[in-house]
Amino acid sequence: MSELHKAFLRRIKEQETALGLSGLVDEDDIPEPAVMPPTGNSSSTANTEDETILRDYKQFKETNFIQEFYENELGHKFKTYYKPSKKPGSILFCHHGAGSSSMTFGNLVNHIEDESVGIFLFDTRGHGESVATSDFSLDTLVQDVSFVLEQFSSKHQQTSIFLLGHSLGGAVLAKYSTLYPSDILKGLILLDIVEEAAVQSLNAMPSFIARRPLSFPSLSKAISWHMNFLLFNEKSARLSVPDLFTDKLTWITDLNATQPYWQTWFSGLSENFLGFKGPKLLMLSTHESLDKQLMIGQMQGKYQLVVFKNNEKSGHFVHEDLPNHVAVCLTDYIKRAVAPEIFMKEDLGVVPKWGGKINK
């Protein structure tokens, strides 16, 4: 077994352990999913806490975004959130992963302080407030991006768009950039997603889904569960978790319904990412995720790599766990891509003495 293969297996084992899973457990040994029982806390206390969480969550949406539904010709509706830039500049077009929603980027939005960067989020089909569907194929998700981005561009004439995708969202945007090349696409950013590691980690998904509670007694308990198993930042969780549940605190997204498409989601991801012509940024929670194609691409200087491997308070949702760190990386990357000479001079204090231009 190669060292690279061993690294992949270690990565998968770490992910299973972090999620409370065991790769040695047979399917017959997996317990039935349970409804999380109520605790000794009084219902009035839980209700008060939930009311506070929901109030802040709704206020955050109303204060920060222009909210719209985009409806395609098939009647599929997509919930969108747009925070315009205060100064002329670029748009960060964000795509979340499977089982998540646009609000996974909520706290990150709070930390992006560059007034020349606008932010656009949307709930992909069957997630958040977008309409449910039975088709979760990669090609369909790419078509959804094409529709949503066309609608957005027709409403808000933009000439500079950076694509940011987390997990599955990264695979969708990487393929979109390959199928729909455009001069307005200035950059491609992937958050904690690598093809080979992603494909292998899918082996743990059935166990993870089977062990999740089917519902929660309160929203605060749902947040606590996420903090115990998936997230490290409660401020982020209070914005992202409410978007995952119905009024009855059951999961909005049926991840089991997506299973037929899992094996195709990440096919060709590394090739699509490296094939993008503009500046590329890959942010990972650990170095062990890099596959052979990305290792070669990194050595050839084809993309920028940022790894948060030394921080124990971050995991797969690195943008939720470390929103300030990720925001700084994003804004620096965008500045450097748009105007490298200005970035070098004003942000780094470096002025090239040879009189030439700095390559992007």
UniProtKB/Swiss-Prot annotation:
EC number: 3.1.1.89
Record carries keyword Hydrolase: yes
Top-level lineage group: Eukaryota
UniProt-annotated stretches for the region Disordered: 26-50
GO-annotated cellular components: mitochondrial small ribosomal subunit
Active site (UniProt): 167, 192, 316
Keywords attached to this entry: Hydrolase, Serine esterase
Any GO MF annotation of the entry: protein C-terminal methylesterase activity
Record field: catalytic activity: [phosphatase 2A protein]-C-terminal L-leucine methyl ester + H2O = [phosphatase 2A protein]-C-terminal L-leucine + methanol + H(+)
Signal peptide: none
Pfam family, one: Abhydrolase_1
Stated family: Belongs to the AB hydrolase superfamily.
Function recorded in the entry: Demethylates proteins that have been reversibly carboxymethylated. Demethylates the phosphatase PP2A catalytic subunit. Involved in the regulation of filamentous growth.
Name assigned to this protein: Protein phosphatase methylesterase 1
Organism: Candida albicans (strain SC5314 / ATCC MYA-2876)
Gene coding for it: PPE1
